[in-house]
Amino acid sequence: DIEMENTHSLDLIQMGVIPDDTVMNQLEGTVRAVILSHGHLDHIGAVPKLVHRYNAPIIGTPYTIELVKQQIEGEKKFGVNNKLIALKCGQRYNISNTLGMEFVRTQHSIIDTATVALYTPKGAIVYALDFKLDRNPVLGEPPDFAKLKKIGKEGVLCLITESTNVNKKGRCPSEQIAKNMVRDVITSYEDDKNAIIVSTFASHIARVKTIAECAHEIGRKPLLLGRSMERYCVTAEQMKMVRFPDTTSVFGNRRVVERTLRRLIKSGKEQYVPIVTGHQGEPGSILTRIAQNDTPYKIERGDKVMISAQLIPNDMNRAQRYRMFTMLKSQGARIFDELHVSGHAYCEDHYEMVHLLNPQFIISAHGGIDLTSEYLGLATELGYTLNKDFFLMANGQRQKLA
């Protein structure tokens, strides 16, 4: 573990925690803007450490910019004074005399996600990281298909697209599917006297909303516990982007969380549904500490533990989650995992995106070569040729398009 706020950017670059932007020194021209497609940490986490080097505004959707503000306020090493521009989807912004941009509404596992359209004299460059084409979202509106089609007709020079789930057949299931899965499990225990505790991504506001509403439906009070739950959910509610049931309470500070868990045990676990972090088995997270008996909240035989999140596939997460599940099961917990749908486009979603935009060139991104190369099969099927109009690139590589 490292303390991001107190660590120098060059040290973080060396550790591989944040991007190595020294490659920018080799490029001609000036950085005119830093554009953020959404508020997940792998997209905004490096902002406080890097953007002070550039005399450029930071542009994002309103929720993303609010999260960036919080990131910057927590920065201890650098003073970040870049202008922050909150741009709603559908609004156009002129970066320079020859460059314009627009956010196009899409869906992902965090609210206020956008696909970026950068307008150049040679055509649009569309940055689609990350996205899914959910026509029936739980929160927010469906993707702006009309705008994507319009951009395609006007001419797209290049599509830079995520590749995370391009190897999965069909279309990515709607968030409504996850809502039904979660509701099916929670409501089936309406008369149960055992505890129900749920863990999900704190940034997945639509999912947290679903869990809170299902808890309220069976007469239990939703409790959002942990600093990240507080940060993401309170911010969204203050911005009127979500409304949780009136019975919902939020506690972020660790000592307050401990007191809340102690009070919960005294008044009866069957009256509440704690919604917590820790679905990956992360050390120090609330669910992991509960599994280790490090909190006042004790698991008893028959208690229900729901995991509304997918395992992020790496060896450390697998080992940590296995250890956590083993401890929970040894205490008698009933575990329901994988109550989840992805926030990343599947193969047929990518197929639709390419047909909407009809780009001259495609660059697959977001993942190692094992993921980005999966896009090659689809690109070939669509008439693109490797190293001619479809490119597999590594960080720091350059490709001339026009």
Language model features with spans:
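Proline-aspartate-enriched helix->loop->beta-strand connector
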Residues: 56, 156-157, 350-367
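His/Asp/Glu-rich metal-coordinating catalytic cores
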Residues: 1-33, 40-260, 289-292, 319
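Structural motif
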Residues: 26, 85, 150-151, 266, ...
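Residues that line or immediately flank small-molecule/substrate-binding pockets and catalytic motifs
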Residues: 38, 163, 366, 394
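Hard-cation-handling environments
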Residues: 171-308, 313-334, 339, 349, ...
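Conserved donor sugar-nucleotide recognition element shared by glycan-biosynthetic enzymes
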Residues: 346
